[in-house]
């Protein structure tokens, strides 16, 4: 499916045009066009990307393929960007969605395979008040990216709450659930995925903010610097959460190790205390005739030796403060 919006001096003058109409609009340099491709068929993608806009084959190939890492490429007449939105789905699973952008002087083409809240909110903004963001394709692209980055905050809040709950489980529970390690692994993967896309996105924003590309007007540079600042803050928060997660993991492992050592200590002490009795029982349990068996008080003496050695072992362990 594709949506198209045509602007003239900040006003929305047409929408949802077919490929032939878009070619005619492209010929009028006074009009601005935004085409949004949402999960297009191969025919729709080819019609727009190749036939209408004549983008470079390598850029089209990258656009239609899945890319894990954000990037920006300059094709002189337009910029090609790969960015990623993040969210939690209905099953509370962290996921990322790729957004491809072709930014030209008079056009913006976006492509994504899944619904994006930033695109939806931008379309709603255009339909209500297009003049605020539709006076330039660089401004429209910034609004899209800024809205997308703003959506990172709820994800960070969810991750913060999940790691906080994990901390409570580790610090407050006498015996943490066996699922703790699985929770650690899932949170670690989510944070790693987030950091893998935030770092290169920050680099993309940095290049946009420092005026490297002629298609980004100087008046927009402060806005892209603000976008860069937001990404820096997100990266810092993600790094802090990553450290917090590993600190909690260290506490959990130390706690588990301590509890294991306590169990081993108890078993070792039991073994030490009962060793004299076991030795005596083993010695006199041999199937041999011993002179002691003929003694009148052999049995009471054996019991007494057992008790004395056991009590002596307990006293010795207490003096060593091992018990």
Where do the language-model regions lie?
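Hydrophobic alpha-helical transmembrane segments and their immediately adjacent juxtamembrane loops
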Residues: 229-323
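Peripheral, non-transmembrane regulatory/ligand-interaction domains of membrane transport proteins
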Residues: 1-219, 223-240, 292, 322-323
């Amino acid at each position: 499916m594709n949506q198209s919006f045509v602007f003239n001096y900040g006003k929305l003058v047409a929408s949802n045009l077919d490929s032939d109409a878009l070619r005619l609009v492209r010929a009028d340099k006074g009009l601005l066009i935004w085409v949004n491709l949402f999960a297009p068929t191969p025919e729709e993608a080819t019609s727009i990307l190749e036939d209408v806009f004549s983008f470079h084959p390598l850029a089209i190939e990258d656009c239609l393929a899945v890319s894990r890492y954000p990037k920006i490429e300059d094709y002189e007449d337009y910029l090609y960007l790969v960015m990623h939105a993040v969210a939690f789905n209905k099953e509370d699973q962290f996921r990322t969605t790729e957004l491809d952008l072709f930014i030209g002087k008079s056009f913006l083409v976006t492509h994504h395979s899944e619904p994006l809240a930033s695109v939806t909110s931008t379309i709603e903004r255009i339909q209500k008040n297009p003049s605020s963001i539709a006076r330039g394709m660089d401004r429209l692209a910034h609004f899209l990216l800024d809205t997308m980055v703003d959506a990172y905050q709820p994800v960070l809040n969810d991750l913060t709450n999940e790691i906080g709950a994990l901390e409570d489980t580790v610090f407050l529970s006498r015996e943490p659930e066996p699922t703790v390690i699985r929770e650690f692994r899932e949170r670690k993967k989510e944070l790693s995925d987030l950091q893998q896309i935030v770092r290169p996105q920050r680099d993309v924003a940095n290049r946009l903010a420092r005026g490297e590309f002629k298609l980004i007007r100087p008046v927009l540079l402060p806005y892209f610097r603000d976008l860069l600042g937001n990404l820096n803050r997100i990266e810092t928060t993600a790094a802090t959460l990553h450290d917090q997660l590993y600190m909690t993991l260290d506490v959990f492992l130390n706690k588990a190790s301590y509890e294991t050592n306590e169990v081993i200590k108890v078993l070792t002490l039991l073994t030490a205390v009962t060793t004299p009795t076991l030795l005596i029982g083993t010695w006199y349990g041999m199937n041999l005739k011993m002179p002691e068996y003929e003694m009148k008080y052999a049995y009471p003496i054996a019991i007494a030796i057992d008790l004395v050695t056991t009590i002596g072992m307990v006293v010795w362990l207490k003096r060593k403060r091992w018990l």
